[in-house]
């Protein structure tokens, strides 16, 4: 498999239904099984690529600790970011302008997801989903790492890396893309502001790739400070059906050149490898 693109010969409705039906499990309607908006809508299943793609296409994501059964969530409200609305702070712009760091796409997925899985006490700060459960090894345990690494191998899960001027990985993020939406999973930083630069890089990449919404799942102060907003679950699911049927640029290991951090503030898009 690879990232789905509607070839134009299939109606958007049929295309969306095809993606939703990929898995072998029938997920329930969130509004029916969770009318109070607590967030959890199903228990069980597996983390096979087809199951995950089907779940994400229906607005669900897995969230569970290592010693718990697989739980599927569709929170109310939903935290999202529109790439065109993102405005970095003045201090981050100043930092980027004088930085000698660079960003890459899909060059160190294994390292990024491993760094995101480390407890904060290890000197690694995991920023994206602070509201999610943090156990001994956080919620990104071996089963999750294996599942998303396979999604990466199949072309769905993607990472953005931040490298310092000595070539050390100091920050990054990962998530998956279906059509015109990117589902953010987690990000980390070892050096100050590295995850903010990774997020800015994601916004730039999405803006120039026809990815019109980034799903941040659960709101927290960090995300809201970056310009995220919340949507009702109903509104999010309505937009999701439209977005997953949209075509967007293909992201793979060699699709984009490294991006010097000072270029984040320019109008120049993240350059493709031609």
Curated annotation (Swiss-Prot):
It is an enzyme of class 2 (transferase). The keyword Glycoprotein does not apply. One of its GO terms (cellular component) is cytoplasm. Its main location: cytoplasm. InterPro entries: Acyl_CoA_acyltransferase, Leu/Phe-tRNA_Trfase, Leu/Phe-tRNA_Trfase_C, Leu/Phe-tRNA_Trfase_N. It catalyses: N-terminal L-lysyl-[protein] + L-leucyl-tRNA(Leu) = N-terminal L-leucyl-L-lysyl-[protein] + tRNA(Leu) + H(+); N-terminal L-arginyl-[protein] + L-leucyl-tRNA(Leu) = N-terminal L-leucyl-L-arginyl-[protein] + tRNA(Leu) + H(+); L-phenylalanyl-tRNA(Phe) + an N-terminal L-alpha-aminoacyl-[protein] = an N-terminal L-phenylalanyl-L-alpha-aminoacyl-[protein] + tRNA(Phe). GO terms for molecular function: leucyl-tRNA--protein transferase activity. It is found in: Cytoplasm. The keyword Lipoprotein does not apply. Keywords: Acyltransferase, Cytoplasm, Transferase. Transmembrane segments: none annotated. Its EC number is 2.3.2.6. GO terms for biological process: protein catabolic process. NCBIfam families: aat (TIGR00667). Belongs to the L/F-transferase family. Functions in the N-end rule pathway of protein degradation where it conjugates Leu, Phe and, less efficiently, Met from aminoacyl-tRNAs to the N-termini of proteins containing an N-terminal arginine or lysine. This is Leucyl/phenylalanyl-tRNA--protein transferase. It comes from Psychrobacter cryohalolentis (strain ATCC BAA-1226 / DSM 17306 / VKM B-2378 / K5). The gene is aat.
């Amino acid at each position: 498999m690879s990232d789905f693109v509607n070839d134009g010969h299939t109606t958007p409705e049929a295309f969306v239904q095809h993606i939703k039906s990929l898995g072998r499990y029938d997920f329930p309607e969130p509004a029916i099984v969770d009318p109070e908006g607590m967030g959890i809508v199903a228990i069980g299943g597996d983390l096979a690529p087809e199951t995950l793609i089907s779940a994400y296409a229906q607005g669900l994501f897995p969230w569970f600790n290592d010693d718990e059964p697989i739980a599927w969530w569709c929170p109310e409200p939903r935290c999202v970011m529109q790439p065109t609305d993102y405005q970095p702070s003045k201090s981050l712009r100043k930092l980027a302008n004088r930085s000698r760091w660079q960003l890459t796409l899909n060059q160190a997925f294994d390292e990024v997801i491993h760094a995101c899985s480390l407890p904060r006490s290890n000197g690694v700060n995991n920023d994206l989903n602070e509201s999610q459960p943090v156990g001994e090894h956080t919620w990104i345990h071996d089963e999750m790492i294996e599942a998303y690494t396979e999604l990466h191998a199949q072309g769905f899960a993607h990472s953005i890396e931040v490298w310092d001027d000595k070539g050390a990985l100091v920050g990054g993020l990962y998530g998956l893309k279906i059509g015109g939406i990117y589902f953010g999973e987690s990000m980390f930083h070892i050096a100050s502001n590295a995850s903010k630069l990774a997020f800015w890089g994601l916004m730039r990449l999405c803006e120039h790739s026809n990815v019109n919404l980034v799903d941040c799942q659960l709101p927290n102060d960090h995300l809201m400070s970056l310009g995220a907003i919340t949507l009702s679950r109903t509104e999010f699911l309505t937009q999701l059906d439209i977005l997953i049927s949209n075509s967007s640029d293909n992201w793979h290991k060699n699709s984009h050149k490294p991006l010097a951090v000072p270029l984040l503030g320019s109008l120049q898009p993240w350059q493709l490898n031609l």
